Amino acid sequence: MTTQVDFWFDPTCPWAWMTSRWILEVEKVRDVKVTFHTMSLYILNEGRDLDPGYRERIDATLVASRAAAAVQKLHGHDVLRDFYTALGTRIHPGGEPVTVETVAAALADCGLEAGIAERVTTDEFDTDLRAYQKVAQDLVGTDVGTPVIRVNGMALFLSLI
């Protein structure tokens, strides 16, 4: 029987990135089906008293999570998986900054419409992003980060540190 793994990620989180690469390797050698879902460190940390430097970094993540939410809404989870790989590869091993330009390049890598990149500077996809975030938070609470992983209905926050 196939094990269903649901994986919530913020595209900018290095811990989620490393864990996502691991679970995709697991999927190659085990009877596992991974479905990726968007979440947002920006939304998770809204209203919290954070160190100013950390707040600045968190605020910069919003364009990436909005882009992922847009892809999830417009194209579904399979395309989101490919977009996360494209964007994550640019950000994490690639060292590219989290910008609209990096989002646009990742969209192009996936053959997706460039117009999405222009829309991530608006709040157009925020309602969707908040709904995706709420699902993750309802599973594990608000005192966690990313990734959130649900395996056959049992959810956890996976911290690598």
Report residues per predicted region.
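Short strand-loop junctions, especially beta-strand C-caps/beta-turns
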Residues: 8-10, 90, 121
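Local sequence-structure signature of Cys/Sec-based thiol-disulfide redox active-site neighborhoods
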Residues: 1-23
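C-terminal cap of thioredoxin/glutaredoxin-like
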Residues: 22-26, 100-161
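Structural alpha/beta surface segment adjacent to cysteine/selenocysteine redox centers
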Residues: 17-103
